[in-house]
């Protein structure tokens, strides 16, 4: 809170991960306390832990009482490709996006653009169509893949699954921004 004067009206707390929703009890307490001091709160999430099953759903709704904004990563709209990329289905992620729209919770959608994995035109079109069904999207961002973290995998002796994948070129980035209509949301 010592930085609150520096933030003025444009700052706050963003919790990212790993996956912050795996620590939902902590988040509820942390954000509740932040709100007591008038601090803006944001969750940066991949959304996979989301479920409408109890007890998670009640806790999630309580957390939303203290959350101002969510940054939601939709890595791939195509479920088969999403499973290939991440190892799990995107069903919970898309359901979370729909639920956040139902409750009118502000969201920024973020899409990591990885050549030959998440940059297919037909999938970008489908993602755009999905985003169009949501009433709460304030911003859409294309995040071009980069190799800055590859050394961490090498240091740990873990095979880097994207070894040899190059960042997208300006054309592919521009194409994704156009298809996802990012300029409409800025």
Model segments located where?
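Conserved AdoMet/S-adenosylmethionine-binding subsite of the radical SAM
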Residues: 2-12, 17, 21-143, 148
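A structural motif corresponding to the C-terminal lobe/cap of the Radical SAM core domain
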Residues: 129, 138, 154-179
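Radical SAM enzyme core and accessory elements
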Residues: 182-186
């Amino acid at each position: 809170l010592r930085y609150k004067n520096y933030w003025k009206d444009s700052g706050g707390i963003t919790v990212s991960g790993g996956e912050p929703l795996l620590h939902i009890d902590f988040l509820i307490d942390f954000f509740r306390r932040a709100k007591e001091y008038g601090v803006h709160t944001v969750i940066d999430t991949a959304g996979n832990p989301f479920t409408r099953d109890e007890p998670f759903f009640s806790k999630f709704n309580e957390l939303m009482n203290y959350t101002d904004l969510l940054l939601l990563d939709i890595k791939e709209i195509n479920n088969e490709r999403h499973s290939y990329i991440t190892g799990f289905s995107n069903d919970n992620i898309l359901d979370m996006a729909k639920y956040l729209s139902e409750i009118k919770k502000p969201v920024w959608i973020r899409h990591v653009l990885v050549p030959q994995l998440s940059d297919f035109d037909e999938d970008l079109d489908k993602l755009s169509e999905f985003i169009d069904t949501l009433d709460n999207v304030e911003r859409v961002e294309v995040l071009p893949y980069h190799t800055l973290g590859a050394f961490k995998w090498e240091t740990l002796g873990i095979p880097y699954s994207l070894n040899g994948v190059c960042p997208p070129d300006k054309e592919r980035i521009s194409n994704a921004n156009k298809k996802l209509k990012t300029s409409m949301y800025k």
